[in-house]
């Protein structure tokens, strides 16, 4: 029987060198790809059935072929490592353990489509992942050859992970999505009239699957997963489970098995109330837990696999509070280029907020929130308003009785539920959430907490400091300011 473990991405311990990675894989996939005709490699990617692991599940071979066959001969390869979907941490975990497979996959893609310009877009806060990528690039110079690979550090915004906004960041702009009718494989990087410069934009996990397909073949890759979604998937399981973590399993494992067997189930004998597949798909209720987690099966229940980040909420969860968190997150992260998106999500978020205040809660809040969410996707450049029009109404209509109770008892369930934006993971300890997200405002700035009276700077400190400044150095001025502040004289 063929050894399908060679297609798995995450080693037991992180690879500390390219040599260690190669000793495990046994073959140089990049060298093999260069010894094959690009069409032969593309045929193998097509035959493997590899689908994008970043959200939509688009066939990888189809995307590559679009760029390869584009009449413009200036082409780019772009890795989307700007992970930010709530409940997802798999790309960061992959880059910490195996950046070599990601880079090899990019080099192979470049060979197929005829590109020597490669970019990896990643959030500047991902310090460990950036360090591992840079070290891997240095160690792989011989394989990289005359290609150039640049790591581009970008902002914290959720929309940085949207592929058209990601290209804008690489070009030095804000993470604002381009018009929807210009996908990257038609208009890529640094485009100009007559030179659209198409780009392959794939998720980090997608690229990481490519080397093993080249080494072992499409048939071997298809021995894992399902016909709809071949191969393995990096699942992130968080929330109310005993063993939260990032788990690599064959695509199609039932969600119930992921929760109960892989992640240890819901603690204390509690029951699952709802599962979020990020904030991009319809929430999953207990009657759907036996669904296989591949793209097709999840679509059949009206939800989506997305980036395979599942957040489990037990039966103590108050759904209006969860809907409040989701609505606020999407409203805050909207870029305001499409007025219907920002205004619709503002309406939804504010209406749900008002249900928690006895001074503002009215019977109009529920229909107003539904209207706002459903009105958001009009002329949209990206998928964010569509997410709002799906996730928010699904929570509201699926648990309407809780919203009725909330209206009648506005202060009974006041404790907020944080949006599960995962900042770090430590095995055995679990996930840390991004504590700054709650302070983010709709203009993408951050609120600051009031300064306590005990540490407030006296209003006359500047004048007193100027009187005594003289020819003091900067360091001396800082010390003097501190002394004046502390002694009040």
Ranges and model annotations:
Residues 1-20, 183, 190-194, 200, ...:
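Intrinsic disorder at enzyme termini
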Residues 39-50, 264-275, 316-337, 354-381, ...:
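Immediate flanking context of iron-sulfur cluster ligation sites
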Residues 47-61, 158-160, 272-282, 303, ...:
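Local cysteine-cluster metal-coordination motifs and their immediate loop/turn environment
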Residues 130-251, 263:
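Hydrophobic alpha-helical positions that pack around
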Residues 472-489:
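Short, basic amphipathic alpha-helical segments that act as recognition/interaction helices
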């Amino acid at each position: 029987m063929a050894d399908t473990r060679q297609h798995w991405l995450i080693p037991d311990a992180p690879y500390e060198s390219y040599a260690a990675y190669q000793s495990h894989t046994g073959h140089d996939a990049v060298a093999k790809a260069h010894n094959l005709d690009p069409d032969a490699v593309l045929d193998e990617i097509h035959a493997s059935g590899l689908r994008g692991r970043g959200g939509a599940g688009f066939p990888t071979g189809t995307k590559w072929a679009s760029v390869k066959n584009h009449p413009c001969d200036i082409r780019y390869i772009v890795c989307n490592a700007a992970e930010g979907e709530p409940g997802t941490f798999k790309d960061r975990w992959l880059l910490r353990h195996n950046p070599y497979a990601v880079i090899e996959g990019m080099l192979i893609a470049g060979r197929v489509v005829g590109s020597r310009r490669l970019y990896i877009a990643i959030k500047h806060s991902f310090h460990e992942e950036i360090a591992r990528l840079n070290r891997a690039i240095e160690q792989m110079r011989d394989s990289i050859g005359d290609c150039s690979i640049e790591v581009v550090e970008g902002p914290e915004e959720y929309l940085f992970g949207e592929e058209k906004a990601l290209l804008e960041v690489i070009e030095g702009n804000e993470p604002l999505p381009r018009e929807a009718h210009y996908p990257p494989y038609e208009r890529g990087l640094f485009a100009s009239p007559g030179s659209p410069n198409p780009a392959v934009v794939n998720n980090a996990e997608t690229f990481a699957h490519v080397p093993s397909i080249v080494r072992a073949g499409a048939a071997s890759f298809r021995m894992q997963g399902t016909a709809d979604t071949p191969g393995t998937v990096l699942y992130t399981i968080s929330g109310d489970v005993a063993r939260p973590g990032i788990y690599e399993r064959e695509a199609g494992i039932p969600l119930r098995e992921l929760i109960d067997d892989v992640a240890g189930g819901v603690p204390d004998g509690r029951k699952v109330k709802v599962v979020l597949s990020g904030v991009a798909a319809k929430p999953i209720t207990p009657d759907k837990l036996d669904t296989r987690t591949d793209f097709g099966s999840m679509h059949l229940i009206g939800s989506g696999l997305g980036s395979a980040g599942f957040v489990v909420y037990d039966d103590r969860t108050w759904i209006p509070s969860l809907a409040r968190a989701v609505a606020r997150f999407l409203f805050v992260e909207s870029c305001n280029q499409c007025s219907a998106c920002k205004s619709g999500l503002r309406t939804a978020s504010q209406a749900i907020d008002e249900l928690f205040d006895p001074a503002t809660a009215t019977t109009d809040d529920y229909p107003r929130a539904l209207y706002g969410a459903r009105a958001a996707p009009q002329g949209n450049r990206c998928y964010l308003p569509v997410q709002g029009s799906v996730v928010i109404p699904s929570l509201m209509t699926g648990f309407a009785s809780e919203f009725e109770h909330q209206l009648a008892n506005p202060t009974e369930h006041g404790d907020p539920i944080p949006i599960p934006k995962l900042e770090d993971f430590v095995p055995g300890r679990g996930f840390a959430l991004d504590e700054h997200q709650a302070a983010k405002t709709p203009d993408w700035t951050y609120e600051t907490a009031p300064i306590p009276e005990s540490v407030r700077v006296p209003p006359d400190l500047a004048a007193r400091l100027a009187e005594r400044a003289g020819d003091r150095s900067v360091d001396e001025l800082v010390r003097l300011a501190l002394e004046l502040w502390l002694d009040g004289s």
